[in-house]
Each structure stands twice: as C-alpha cells, then as structure tokens.
Amino acid sequence: MGQKTNPNGLRLGIIRTWESQWCVNDKEIPNLIKEDFLIRKLINNFTKKSAISQIDIERLKEKNKNRITISVHTAKPGVIIGKDGDTRNKLVAKLKELTQKDVNLNVLEVKNSDKNALLIAQNMAEQLENRMFFRRVQKMAIQKALKAGAKGVKTLISGRLGGAEIARSEGHAEGRVPLHTLRADIDYAAVEAHTTYGVLGIKVWIFHGEVLPGQTILDTRKPFASQSSNTPNRRPRNFKGGNNNHVNAKKN
C-alpha cells in the first residue's frame, strides 16, 4: 500500500518528525491544531512569492506556554525578512495579534530548492498556469532534481491536459522511487495549478536516499550530493495515473 498512502505521513516517527511539536492536555489539542492551521495560512498568504517549503511550530517549554517558536524554511529569505527586517517585524506583529502570545520567528534558507518536492511542484504549477506544455514541464523539473543530486524523481499531472475535453493523468519518472521502503527518504508534495481550462493536480515524489542506522534525514539531504556511481541508470518512463504498468518513454 505504499503506492496509495502519503509518503510523508507513512514515515512519521520512523525517519521523519512532526512539523508541529507540543505536548498539552487533551482538552487543549483542538484549539492548538486550529491555531497551527491559522498560523500557516497567515504566513503563506502574507508572503505568497517567498517559496516557503515548510513551517515548523514548537511549544516545548511547559513553564512558558505563551511563547511560540516558528521556523519558516524558504528559498527566498530576503522576501520574508525585507529591508532592515521590516517585513519580518510586520509578520511577527500579525502573528502576535492572531495568537495573543509571544512569537519567536526564525527564517531559514533552503539551500537547494531543486531537490525540494513542494518548491518543485509550485514551480511546475506556475509554468502550467503560464501555458507551458505539461510534458516539457515534467521533464525539466526531473532533470533539475537529478542534476541537484536526487536519486529518483516521479511526477504526475492530472486534469484537462492540453485543454482536452476528457480529464486524464500522465506522469514521468526517472531513477528509483521505492515507496514501500520505510527507511527511504522520500519527499512528497501535491499542488494545484489554476489554468484557463480548469484545475490541474500536480504530485511530486523525490527520493533522496536511504536513512541507515545511526543516520538522520539530514544526511540524505545535503546541499549538494552527486548521484552515487552505484545507482543503476534506468531509462525514463512515462505512465498514466491509476495504472502502475510503466511504459518505456520514446526516444527523442
């Protein structure tokens, strides 16, 4: 069932950790879940073009429950920080107004955006909205990820592809993407692209490598790690959604 589940959720507690970390009484859980949702929504809407890949929220100190530490991972930290930190200060003020708590905001740079599934999916959505051909969009994204050091990449686009009357799904994959291997560090993201023909769904899977005993997920996601020479060279393959029977891609 590794093909059907969300790879991020399937690996929680094994090689991945939670983006929201706090320990409270059962009665407080619903309120904090809602608060985390509103915090992420506010940050994403406040800085729409800042290429945010992840937002971590921590409430770890029981003695100081009114303090929240928020870490924003972005490929464009300058957009969030702003000139002399003006944009960051405005964002902190809005977060304090929303939560009525003391907020500590950390802005962390994503050093290699070509290996991040969410940033790749967002970039693909932007290109599709600009009417670029969907097959070219997939191949360009895959080539960039492999060049950046990914061990394998798989993409899937669903909807009215090319303006067709009947919606369908079409994907492209290169390298290894072992969805059934729980120690495999697989980054997954799903994004929507709003085009003139309707909404297209975009899914991206990126295999960074296997997390062996004594290692962490950070060891497989170094800023740049060239592909191992032991990795078998597999031919690119196209496939259609809902069908796991891969078809060899035609040679150009």
UniProtKB/Swiss-Prot annotation:
Any one GO cellular component localisation term in the record: cytosolic small ribosomal subunit
Molecular function per GO: mRNA binding; rRNA binding; structural constituent of ribosome
SMART domains in the cross-refs: KH
InterPro entries, A to Z: KH_dom, KH_dom-like_a/b, KH_dom_type_2, KH_sf_prok-type, Ribosomal_S3_C_sf, Ribosomal_uS3_bac-typ, Ribosomal_uS3_C, Ribosomal_uS3_CS
Ranges for region Disordered: 222-252
Biased composition (Polar residues): 241-252
PROSITE patterns: KH_TYPE_2, RIBOSOMAL_S3
CDD domains in the record: KH-II_30S_S3 (cd02412)
Gene Ontology biological-process entries: translation
Keyword terms, alphabetized: Ribonucleoprotein, Ribosomal protein, RNA-binding, rRNA-binding
Highest taxon of the lineage: Bacteria
Residues annotated as domain KH type-2: 39-111
Assembly mode: Part of the 30S ribosomal subunit. Forms a tight complex with proteins S10 and S14.
Function: Binds the lower part of the 30S subunit head. Binds mRNA in the 70S ribosome, positioning it for translation.
Similarity section: Belongs to the universal ribosomal protein uS3 family.
Protein name per UniProt: Small ribosomal subunit protein uS3
Native species: Phytoplasma sp. (strain PY1)
Gene that encodes it: rpsC
